[in-house]
């Protein structure tokens, strides 16, 4: 990455054409931005954009779509770079992203009086787009389930957004550390801990659900709990680092993630949540 700066431009372009391009493209952007000088990085972005335009011409993909994809991937990644440079701590940055997510959730419910109706309208628009694109069956299935989906949309969108950008930052910092052979800069993902404050906040908001049946409180409880899946994953990485679990165990976790998404994330969240209370790492060390 450092010896051949043009390799960075190639990486930026190619990762936007891969599956999960927002994650791999964003992580590559974070790593290169941290590694390169500002001038070299701007050159890499320019070359990558030129390369994407040429690729679009060759394989008959809309250049506008490729450039919009680049903007939608790189702009949030740039904000993550600014955040990590300010905090100088990966753990604190991920915690701040969680705080921003909670604040956004509260702001959303303050601004939108009836979130379910809001998401109903959004999903109906999506259904219309699917119909226009010839995906009639998918549009029909969406329309039939629209009420149930709309009730879950707020928590799903916010939790997924936080998860995606946290993973982008973690992966980008990991690539950067490898490129400079410094495993300690910005701290280690294996040390991620949201602490007892968030654990208590999750418990209190969950208990209040038995007294107050309000949507924002329900979403807040689920959102706070969902943060802990990443702490559960970091604990697995710590166990692997300490050679308590084999590499195959960690690999299987990632392999199963797309197939048992909700179940596995819930299990990881339970591990992470209990870790916040009992600090498994210290107990195992002792």
For each predicted feature, which ranges?
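Short helix-perturbing small/polar motifs within transmembrane alpha-helices
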Residues: 56-59, 67-111
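Long, positively charged, glycine-interspersed low-complexity recognition regions
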Residues: 214-215, 221-286
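Alpha-helical membrane segments and adjacent membrane-interface helices in multi-pass membrane proteins
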Residues: 22-81, 271-275
């Amino acid at each position: 990455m450092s010896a051949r700066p043009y390799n960075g431009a190639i990486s930026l372009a190619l990762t936007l054409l891969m599956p999960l391009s927002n994650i791999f493209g964003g992580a590559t952007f974070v790593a290169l931005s941290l590694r390169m000088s500002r001038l070299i990085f701007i050159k890499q972005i320019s070359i990558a954009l030129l390369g994407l335009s040429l690729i679009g011409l060759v394989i008959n993909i809309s250049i506008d779509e490729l450039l919009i994809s680049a903007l939608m991937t790189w702009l949030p990644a740039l904000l993550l770079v600014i955040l990590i440079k300010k905090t100088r701590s990966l753990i604190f940055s991920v915690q701040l992203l969680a705080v921003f997510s909670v604040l956004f959730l509260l702001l959303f419910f303050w601004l939108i009086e009836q979130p379910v109706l809001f998401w109903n309208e959004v999903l109906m628009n999506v259904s219309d787009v699917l119909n226009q694109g010839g995906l009639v069956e998918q549009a029909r299935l969406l329309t039939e389930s629209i009420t149930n989906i709309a009730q879950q949309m707020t928590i799903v969108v916010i939790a997924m957004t936080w998860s995606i950008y946290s993973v982008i930052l973690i992966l980008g910092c990991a690539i950067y550390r490898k490129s400079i052979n410094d495993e300690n800069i910005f701290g280690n993902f294996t040390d991620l801990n949201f602490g007892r404050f968030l654990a208590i906040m999750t418990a209190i908001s969950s208990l209040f659900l038995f007294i107050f049946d309000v949507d924002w409180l329900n979403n807040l409880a689920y959102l706070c709990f969902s943060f802990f899946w990443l702490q559960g994953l970091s604990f697995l990485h710590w166990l692997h680092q300490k050679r308590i679990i084999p590499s195959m165990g960690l690999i299987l976790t990632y392999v199963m993630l797309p197939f048992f998404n909700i179940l596995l994330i819930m299990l990881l969240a339970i591990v992470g949540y209990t870790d916040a209370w009992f600090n498994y790492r210290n107990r195992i060390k002792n």
